[in-house]
From Swiss-Prot:
Highest taxon, organism lineage: Bacteria
Name of protein: Phosphate acyltransferase
Broadest EC class assigned to this enzyme: transferase
Predominant localisation class: cytoplasm
Family the entry assigns: Belongs to the PlsX family.
Organism: Nitratidesulfovibrio vulgaris (strain ATCC 29579 / DSM 644 / CCUG 34227 / NCIMB 8303 / VKM B-1760 / Hildenborough)
Cited function: Catalyzes the reversible formation of acyl-phosphate (acyl-PO(4)) from acyl-[acyl-carrier-protein] (acyl-ACP). This enzyme utilizes acyl-ACP as fatty acyl donor, but not acyl-CoA.
Compartments where found: Cytoplasm
PANTHER family reported for this sequence: FATTY ACID/PHOSPHOLIPID SYNTHESIS PROTEIN PLSX, PHOSPHATE ACYLTRANSFERASE
Catalytic activity line of the entry: a fatty acyl-[ACP] + phosphate = an acyl phosphate + holo-[ACP]
Length: 345
């Protein structure tokens, strides 16, 4: 494979091919990469027929099954061998693509990524990382749902992987890594957090700044926030819900009378910039860090812009060879990881 090739689950998400196909094609056109659109051939080709394809490298790979949102990931993995999410993962495993993007069943994406694409040697638990807006620059929050029960050395490895991601994808030379807890002071938190803190403190090749609290997530004072998947998913969904609710309240108040409407008109450019900063579609999806190849798991409600951003993120991950940095970090801290495991036994 010469050019970057990204396999896209065309059947994933609430809107399926109608948004996945144009989003993936836009990324291929602007980025000069190739996309493999995996799904029901007839439905995918119907969407392609609506889009100019001059100079765009697109190939349709048929998959006869779709992972249902109400199905268990284990059932999808065992029984739906021709589900689009399984097919995209096999394309990567067999060397036909460099990475995948899916807005479908997130649990199935994680399971298929782990068991078909495989983990980076030394990584025990791949983690979902979410890029989130703050007052200053975006941060990486992980894990946001792949692992609800974790051990201290898992959190430590999450931080190592996110460090490489933040450097390559967000451009932070020395990412500041914080551990999410109930207080900033060393010694605050539950047993998991306190023991993970000790591992981070002993690491020599990362910029660990200590504990951070929930209120610090959006200040931009750190670049990476590490937590287990239960806490991370709650934090992510809480921020999404708060953002949506506040946007509705703001819109209602701004349209409540003549003067608010006039002020809104005068500040329109500022509101547009704000909307762009908090728009999840700008960030695409959550990378599943720790796999042999990159997998981007998108929100089920993703629009074409979000799919395009996710494909671009996957391509950047591949082109910057971020997985090599992940492997190096895991290997360099292998002894410390073993120490963390031994302490827990």
């Amino acid at each position: 494979m010469n050019s970057t090739i990204i396999a896209v689950d065309a059947m994933g998400g609430d809107f399926g091919p109608s948004v996945v196909v144009p989003g993936a094609v836009d990324a291929a056109r602007e980025r000069g990469l190739k996309v493999l659109l995996v799904g029901d051939r007839q439905k995918v080709e119907e969407e392609l027929a609506r889009i100019p394809l001059d100079g765009v490298e697109v190939e349709v790979v048929h998959a006869s099954e779709v992972a249902g949102m109400d199905e268990k990931p284990s059932d999808i993995l065992r029984r739906k061998k021709d589900a689009s999410i399984q097919v995209v993962c096999r394309l990567v495993r067999d060397g036909h693509a460099h990475g995948i993007v899916s807005a479908g069943h997130s649990g199935a994406s994680v399971a298929c990524g782990m068991f078909i694409m495989g983990r980076v040697p030394g990584v025990e638990r791949p983690a979902l990382a979410s890029v989130m807006p703050t007052e200053k620059q975006p941060i990486v929050l992980l894990d946001v749902g792949a692992n609800v029960d974790c051990k201290p050395h898992h959190l430590f490895q999450f931080g190592l992987m996110a460090n490489a991601f933040a450097r390559d994808l967000l451009g932070y030379e020395t990412p500041r890594i914080g551990l999410l807890s109930i207080g900033e002071e060393e010694g605050k938190g539950n047993t998991l957090v306190k023991e993970a803190y000790e591992l981070f403190k002993l690491a020599q090749n990362i910029n660990f700044v200590g504990n951070v609290e929930g209120r610090d997530l959006f200040t931009g004072e750190v670049d990476v926030v590490v937590c287990d998947g239960f806490v991370g998913n709650v934090a992510l969904k809480l921020s999404e819900g708060l953002s949506s609710s506040m946007s509705r309240v703001l819109k209602r108040e701004l349209l409540s009378g003549f003067l608010p409407k006039l002020g809104t008109l005068l500040a329109r450019s500022a509101f547009k910039r704000f909307a762009r900063v908090v728009d999840y579609a700008e960030y695409g999806g959550a990378p599943l860090l720790g796999l042999q190849s990159i997998a981007i798991v998108c929100h089920g409600k993703s629009n074409a812009k979000a799919i395009k951003s996710a494909v671009n993120m996957a391509a950047t991950f591949v082109e910057k060879k971020t997985n090599e940095r992940v492997v190096q970090a895991i290997c360099a801290n292998e002894e410390l990881t073993r120490y963390g495991k031994a302490v827990r036994q």
